[in-house]
Amino acid sequence: MIHSSYHHKDTYEDSKTSSVFETMLMLPDELFWGVLRTACFDNENLPVVAGRIEDYEFWPHWDPTHTTNSTLVEPDVFIRFQSFDVIIEAKYSDRPGQYYQQWKNEIIAYSNEYGSDKPLYFIAVGGNAEKMTESVSAIKDIAITKCTWLSILIQITKLRNEYEGLSTISNNQSSTIRLLNLIELVFNIHGVYNIRWFDEIRISKPLISPDSMMTLKTFFK
């Protein structure tokens, strides 16, 4: 939570946003974007290739002209890739908290700062009442793509498992595994866990019968 401390942000939401994304941004650029894109529920509008991350900023202060804000507009995370820009608006939990006017204000304020030189994508993390993509008409139509904290963690876990399953692990891959473990720990600290089913855990001897596992799963449908 380096960035939340630097910006004097002391809410649970700000600490979670800072801790998760500042560690995720340590991943190689293509892995970071791959995780974030795949975590989104309806990601067909998001490019597969992003290119290099040129810059990023937590809680930038943008010009509020033509918005409903009076002093500034402050998205949570702003990332400039080679090919496009991304606004990330994050909410602490999955209880409804995202709302149209905030999205619209951030898109207008982005246009005030950067014009329309690059394509803009908007990702709403957490706080979504529905999973399907919405559209905001502000300067131009922008799709609001959605995900949850858990859907991001699931992709982090999958990627880590893929690396650990390699027959030979390079030094770079080893450091990536350590970073993915750290990111998972950050999620856990903030109350987000990826539950692993019993039949996915590698053990030498079965601890529970297959019938019992199927019975347990029925309680979590």
Residue ranges and their predicted role:
Residues M1-K221:
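Charged, terminal alpha-helix-loop-beta segments
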